[in-house]
Amino acid sequence: MTRGEMKYEGKAKRVYATENPHEYVVEYKDDATAFNAQKRGEWAGKGATNNAITAHLYPQLEAAGIPTHFLEKLSDREQRVKAVTIVPVEVIVRNVAAGSFSKRLGVEEGTPLPRPVVEYCYKSDALGDPLINTDTAVALGWASEDDLKRIRELALQIRDFLVPYFEKRGVRLIDFKLEFGKLPSGEIVLADEISPDTCRFWDAETNEKMDKDRFRRDLGGEAEAYAEMLKRVTREV
């Protein structure tokens, strides 16, 4: 597959056109950002680790009946995906209070939530990905009511797959962010990635953080935590 012009560069990935107008190549970078890119860093192997984790999980989600943009892993840093139009509404699914949820609502971090909480943010680096509701998304034309209904349905299906998957590997899935895209047919599919960049992972025994919070909160050991998550994700149980 020939990698063509760069279509988009985000904080953690680059997206390239290919000779097939219906497919892209996604390249994972080693860059790390936090607080809407106000804090920046990088470490060797980060992109390859996130690519490997995503490339391991997405086919399993597909097998569970959840449509994704993923086609195949091409190299350590690259994967081939279906070309989608990203819905500019990020979805956060929370199982345990943490991060901005705890700060915003005064709920102690680590408090289990009696049911999953689904939140929506407008995908805009310039505005800091502000929290929105579904009425706002529909009124401003970012997504239709049917799109949002399907997105919520898929997000909860993904949650129901991932929680026991990680539990079997000694990891608590605290919360996670998802992005969805639309195929030319109008079908909604999971896009982006599932990795320590987009999820909060805590060790099930110690509650040690094994995700980007290690960078975000200056805890150190980011590379080691990401490498450990790759080992656990790919562990046969």
From Swiss-Prot:
Q: In which pathway does it act?
A: Purine metabolism; IMP biosynthesis via de novo pathway; 5-amino-1-(5-phospho-D-ribosyl)imidazole-4-carboxamide from 5-amino-1-(5-phospho-D-ribosyl)imidazole-4-carboxylate: step 1/2
- Organism per entry: Deinococcus radiodurans (strain ATCC 13939 / DSM 20539 / JCM 16871 / CCUG 27074 / LMG 4051 / NBRC 15346 / NCIMB 9279 / VKM B-1422 / R1)
Coiled-coil region list: none
UniProt protein name: Phosphoribosylaminoimidazole-succinocarboxamide synthase
Enzyme Commission (EC) number: 6.3.2.6
- By its UniProt entry, which SUPFAM superfamilies does this protein fall under? SAICAR synthase-like (SSF56104)
Q: Which GO terms describe its molecular function?
A: ATP binding; phosphoribosylaminoimidazolesuccinocarboxamide synthase activity
Under the heading HAMAP family, the entry gives: SAICAR_synth (MF_00137)
PANTHER family the record matches: MULTIFUNCTIONAL PROTEIN ADE2, SI:DKEY-6E2.2
Q: PROSITE patterns per the record?
A: SAICAR_SYNTHETASE_1 (PS01057), SAICAR_SYNTHETASE_2 (PS01058)
